Amino acid sequence: MNFELKTLSLAASAAHKCDLLVVLVPEGFLPGSDVLSTMVAHALKQGDLEVKPGKLLQCYAPAGVAARRVVLLGCGAADAHAVRQAMQALSPSFKLPSVKRVALVFGTSAQRGAIGAAVRAVADGSYVYTATKTKAEPRALLRVTLGVPNAGAAQPEFATATAVAAGVEFAREWANRPANHATPTLVANAAKTLAKYPGVQCQVLGPAEVAKLGMGAFLAVAQGSDQPLRLVELRYNGAARTQAPVVLVGKGITFDTGGISLKPAAEMDEMKFDMGGAASVLGVFRALAELRPAINVVGLIPACENMPDGKAVKPGDVVTSMSGQTIEILNTDAEGRLVLCDALTYAARFKPAAVVDIATLTGACVVALGGLRSGLFASDDLLAEQLLSAGDAALDPCWRMPLDDEYAEGLKSNFADMANVAGRAGGSITAAKFLQRFVGDTPWAHLDIAGTAWKGGAAKGATGRPVALLVHYLLDQATVSTVKPKQKTRSRKSVA
């Protein structure tokens, strides 16, 4: 699917040939004398159309319009939130087999973030999972044209939005795949494909190299599976070599049974999504490859399965992490923090400016925040503010949670330096306190995406969050935001 940005007035859009023309109608719409403006004005006057976000009126083959179908779509204040809400009401149309070319025209100048919201809504709404289906219909939508009053002024936001959409889709695709189609080795192979882009490098370590590094916690989780672990190291080099990188660490449990502390059978299939953090790191690098910001980024993915087996780690076992600290594993289903702690220790070798880990870590975070906001834990106030701001701008919000030292009391162990769990109370916080022991003085943040990485029910599937948040954060840190595409075409291709 290709996205295209054009300078297109409401009057000119009437001559644009497409299967679906969407006219976003904001509050205070001022009609001109052209056919579409007249149509909007009449619909508003007769009460057939409201400007409330998501209210719409459909017309088929109206006179004087080249599009086969026209949708007049209310978008309220026309800000990012209102445009997203409006576009979600239209989402089913983007999967219709007859809709191959869509034009989306803003009735007035688009507010900051509105173009990004529109691009993301179309990309998300038209996404079709086909990887393991033999008769699945592929995505029908081939081209999306965004018409704005001034394409040149909108170009930076458009470039970011299309790159983020591609990254989100890459993350969704890998998080959606069944565990036998997304083993640690296959996830590592997906990371290697990103190295074809300029500025991106990939290195993959196997069990022998990980053992040599002394990653006893990571090895302990993986030892119950026949699938060999992989430690993926992605690098994006967009700035001077002397510039300290931001390190992203994504939890990559490609299937989580809970190990010996076995999970209930109901909905265990959803544990293929336990590599949502890893998928988000892949998605971020997919977006960075397009945007090429002036920043250095390292992505680490400790990938393995957590399986019950005669070789599996047992409750009560004590292991030595890469940091040298010993851990009593009271619950083998608290495995994500075990693979992350060694990856966080490994991250120190890059002398990072900041470290952000991303993990579907705790059910407690789902209880606390639901599926709207990711949980944010941070050792540094400035880093926390930067991530909160980026999440708001990207419509991928998070919420800062506490990290008081007293929460770590429950991690005390009689047989090791610490236990891997501290009881049910404050479970998401105690998990973050566990991770904090492995980051030293480096500014560090932990995003618990257990409630936001996927959704259940009829629309079960990965969301691709928090790719948008992370990309916006990295762009904010970069000295040069993007390399502009050729002005002539103003088009971007997303992941198909």
From Swiss-Prot:
Binding locations of Mn(2+) 2: 251, 256, 274, 335
Molecular function, one GO term: metalloaminopeptidase activity
Keyword field contains Iron: no
Classification via Pfam families: Peptidase_M17, Peptidase_M17_N
Cofactor binding remark: Binds 2 manganese ions per subunit.
Names of the cofactor(s): Mn(2+)
Catalytic site positions: 263, 337
Entry superkingdom: Bacteria
GO process annotations (BP): proteolysis
InterPro entries assigned to the protein according to its UniProt record, in alphabetical order: Leucine_aapep/pepB (IPR011356), Macro_dom-like (IPR043472), Peptidase_M17_C (IPR000819), Peptidase_M17_leu_NH2_pept (IPR023042), Peptidase_M17_N (IPR008283)
Entry keyword annotation includes Manganese: yes
GO CC annotation terms, alphabetical: cytoplasm
Entry's EC annotation: 3.4.11.1, 3.4.11.10
Keyword list, A-Z: Aminopeptidase, Cytoplasm, Hydrolase, Manganese, Metal-binding, Protease
Enzyme class: hydrolase
Residue sites binding Mn(2+) 1 per the record: 256, 333, 335
Range of residues in the leader sequence: none
Role, per record: Presumably involved in the processing and regular turnover of intracellular proteins. Catalyzes the removal of unsubstituted N-terminal amino acids from various peptides.
Family statement: Belongs to the peptidase M17 family.
Record protein name field: Probable cytosol aminopeptidase
Organism encoding this protein: Acidovorax sp. (strain JS42)
Gene: pepA
